[in-house]
Amino acid sequence: GTEYTWKAGGSWSPVPSLQIRGGYQRVTRAPNISELFAVPVTGLDNFDTDPCAGAAPTTDANLRAICLAQGAPATSIGSIIVDPAGQVNVTTGGNPNLAAEKANTWTIGAVFQPVFAPGLSMTIDYYNIKLNDAITSPTIGDVFSACFDNNPSPTNPACTSIRRNPATGNLFGNVGTTPGLPLVLTNQGQIFTDGIDLVANYSTDLGFAGLDLGFFGNWTNRSRFKANQDDPASLNRECVGYYSINCASIQPEFSFTQRTTLSFDQVDLSLRWRFIDAVEVEPLVADAFLEDFRTIPSEHYFDLTAVFNVTDSFALTAAVINLFDNEPKVVGSNIGSTSYNSGNVFPSTYDALGRRYSVTARMTF
């Protein structure tokens, strides 16, 4: 098919030190080869809830019918269990019927370079991004909600697409016979985010050394994902400041990186400060977890680097990463997706290695 994209933007400088800028874009992205043709694979992901587990289906005829429609044998009703490891089978894979995803984005911001402060420059930009027909997989929570919430029915495709172990009725077991939850890619997703980026840089000569200060910060106002954009009942899930199996990587409300560098004749000393705002477990699922697992406090990391310019063509760099040996907060193994919460500590966001050292050499010819 044919897709059209376009972009419009402009800038205005009311005074020499200030530039105001803005832009609007209509963009598209076609699915890649993997998204189209990846072979379906059944594996494991974290989740420790199953509406069909326990005695509930024995007293609820509709729930019993749903469990049976998902492939549970009649003899398993009342004895279905949740995996003791807190995991379920999930089937992921490509989709040859995927179409292009489409986004409308707009930004407005300013560039400030004051004549009264040589060496100082600042930019601030508000961004607003809405992605429709997003190439995404539903979250595990969304798959369960589509079936078991809002007048569930044993004939609802959202229910029958969940496939249980044909011997036990569980959602875990042999991957050859238990596809579990369908997480294949579709164009049903909708993603929205907005926030502010702030960048500031300052350079000056202190006499005994050169000083460079750099700052990059982000404030995220909203980061929402809707698994089915065409279903008014589909949850428009907010993930800013939250973590759970239903949110991807942790998105703090505020984060920044600040670097201070002192440059001497042949040595550069640099201290980098990384800040990650505090986050908490998604309110919709908070009660399922221990109190101590429901929050991760704000984190400050410091990295120290020294560059020795031995000659014009040879330099040595020594670094200490995570200078104060900060340890990540342990939050349990099943509170987030295995893609991001491997090892109970969200190593995709937080430093799980502790203080470490490196020495590198660079030679130019």
Residue ranges and their predicted role:
Residues 16-20, 117-122, 208-211, 266-270, ...:
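Repeated loop/turn-to-beta-strand initiation elements of outer-membrane beta-barrel proteins
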Residues 26-76, 122, 128-168:
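A surface-exposed, glycine/aromatic-enriched loop/edge motif typical of exported proteins
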Residues 2-4, 92, 102-106, 192-196, ...:
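Residues that define the transmembrane beta-barrel architecture of outer-membrane proteins
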